[in-house]
Amino acid sequence: MHKIVFVTGNKGKFAEVRDILKNFGIEAIQNKDGYPELQEDELEPIAANGAQYVANKLNMPVMVDDSGIFINALNGFPGPYSRFVEDKLGNPKVLKLMEGEKDRSAYFKTVIGYCEPGQEPLVFPGVVEGKIAYEERGTGGFGYDPIFEYNGMTFGELGDEEKNKVSHRRRAVDNFLEWFIGGA
């Protein structure tokens, strides 16, 4: 069985990735050490830099995840600042920002960064399109899941198993697996 160190302090992210990888015979090992996060408007350089930093620090191959929700009516905000906005404002205030907005389209994006020590990092994006609900719905998932609607249900309503089949993180991990398994 392959083992991959996944660097995140986020229990929800780790559980989602762990559950996806185990279906492919890969064991995810959580490392909560973190890494210096670039302040960028795009997720790709953040994930690439983080993966390279940790791979060289730990001297082993690692995977990191940088994710965000991009709301079109807010010009892509909060995007790469999603965690900060979630911590400071939370879903109720994001919904308040959306009051009166007709365009509720949004997308979740995850970029998986993978790097081996001394190598250049690789990035694997995944996107899922949806819209911002008018209220929080569902108790599943984490973060923005209760306000992100996909095919009529929020990620918070879908439950982990269903969400893990269609999520942005799933799509990014699938892109990674296509490369990893194809090249293994």
UniProtKB/Swiss-Prot annotation:
Cofactor: Mg(2+)
Reaction(s) catalysed (UniProt annotation): XTP + H2O = XMP + diphosphate + H(+); dITP + H2O = dIMP + diphosphate + H(+); ITP + H2O = IMP + diphosphate + H(+)
Enzyme Commission (EC) number: 3.6.1.66
Enzyme class: hydrolase
InterPro entries reported in the protein's UniProt record: dITP/XTP_pyrophosphatase (IPR020922), ITPase-like_fam (IPR029001), RdgB/HAM1 (IPR002637)
One of the GO biological process terms: purine nucleoside triphosphate catabolic process
The entry's keywords: Hydrolase, Magnesium, Metal-binding, Nucleotide metabolism, Nucleotide-binding
Coiled-coil zones: none
Keyword Methyltransferase: no
Cofactor mode of binding and number, as noted: Binds 1 Mg(2+) ion per subunit.
Statement: the UniProt record of this protein carries the keyword Magnesium: yes
Assembly mode: Homodimer.
Xref: NCBIfam families: PRK14821.1, RdgB/HAM1 family non-canonical purine NTP pyrophosphatase
Protein name: dITP/XTP pyrophosphatase
